[in-house]
Every structure is written in structure tokens, then in C-alpha cells.
Amino acid sequence: MVAQQADELTTKHHPDMIFLHSLSESAESAVKYDLEQLSIASLTMDVDFFIVGEVKGTEAMYLINAAYTGQISAATVHSLSAQAAPEKIVDYALQASGNKYNRAELLKMIADCYHTVINVKDYTVYEVLEIDGWDDVTQSIKYKSLYHL
């Protein structure tokens, strides 16, 4: 299942893929679905994978919670580097958490649940990092570089 605002992640031929798109309120319809609502709806479905195409808001908290409950999940996010991607997702999740979690707790949740961070620029893979655990002293994710262009 892929929840996204724009068609960044697509396939026209895979029979087992479900795509949910956000819908803005317009003059023609008062119906509105944002990525947060789509993420909540997605988590109630019996899906094998939960993917958010371009995290940029409160849906980040649902992505982290889904992963932390054992749901296989992935996301795209715009960031400056592979190491900056989890930080960016945490920035968005902090907006949604209402101070329920702090930055270190959310980063540790990511470190516990995700294994790989890939940085893509201009349709080229620039960097691949393995998440190698959590450093309690520095309160940060430990990485192992697997590939760098």
C-alpha cells in the first residue's frame, strides 16, 4: 500500500499494489483526504507493506508507529543527505506527537525499526547507509556506509 500526495512512486502493472492519493478540498467537492488521514486508513487495512511517498507532515508519526509495531514500512523524504533523512522525518513526527515523544526517542524508534537509508539525487543513487544501531551516549543513530558515489 502506497499513500502519497503526488505520483512519485508508481507502477501500472503490479496486481498487488494499492495506491491511495491525497485529495484537496475544491469548489467541486468538500471531500478532503490528506496524507495523515490516508496513513491512518492504510494502517487499518491488512497490507504487507506500508509506504508513504514524500513524507512532509504529521503522517511521519504514523509511519514511525507502523514500523514500531512490526509493520514493514518505507518512505521517501526530501533531505540533504542519507543521514539527514531520519532527522527530517523526526522533525515532522515531532509536529504530530504533541510532546508525547522527544527527538531522541523518535530517532531510537527509527534505529530500531529501519535498516537502510538511500540518498537519491537526479535519479541516481548517491549514498546507501545501513542503520547500525543506536548510540546511547551521543543519542544518535549509528550508520555504516555501504555505498557512496
Annotate the PLM regions.
Residues A111-L149:
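Conserved P-loop NTPase
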